[in-house]
Amino acid sequence: IGSGSGAAGACIVRDRLAPDCRIVGVQSSAAPAAYLSWRAGQIETAPCLTRHSGLATGRGFELPQSVIVAGLADFIIVDDAEISDAARVFAHLAHTLSEGAGAAALAGLLKATSHPDRVAVICTGGNASADEIADLARG
């Protein structure tokens, strides 16, 4: 989660089409403002030190937070290295080029200690920078 608009949209669609579906947010520990806002139930600020630009927010966003505060079943915090590892998994095993923000959901799944029978991971970003692509090529 960066601003939270994607997660909020997923919650709105879920409420209409599949109310039993659980949505779990994932955010970088190096930019935890959305997580802190969700946990507190109010807008929070936090240092933004992540190298994954799509997740780089230093303050929770009011409109998405108003939806995800009740809409998310859980929230997983991952570090930037776990996000980069997930981007490599996408590239090498799924043949999908993802920026770090797009790989965050997979990083959360890989970190989770338990999984339900069926899981969907949404890869939300394919805007990898030249540096990210070079890192993926190095493996």
Predicted regions and their residues:
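A glycine-rich, Thr/Ser-enriched phosphate-binding loop motif common to dinucleotide/cofactor-binding enzymes
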Residues: 99-103
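Active-site/ligand-binding loops adjacent to catalytic centers
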Residues: 16-98, 136-139
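Short beta-strand segments
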Residues: 1-2, 25-27, 121-124
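FAD-binding core of FAD-dependent oxidoreductases
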Residues: 6-7, 55
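Phosphate- and divalent-cation-binding pockets in alpha/beta enzyme and binding domains
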Residues: 9, 33, 85-86, 107-108, ...
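Short, acidic Gly/Pro/Ser/Thr-rich loop/turn segments
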Residues: 8, 31-33, 62, 127-130
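Phosphate-binding loop/pocket of nucleotide- and phosphate-handling active sites
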Residues: 104-139
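Short Gly/Thr/Asp-enriched flexible loops that form oxyanion-binding sites at enzyme active sites
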Residues: 7-17
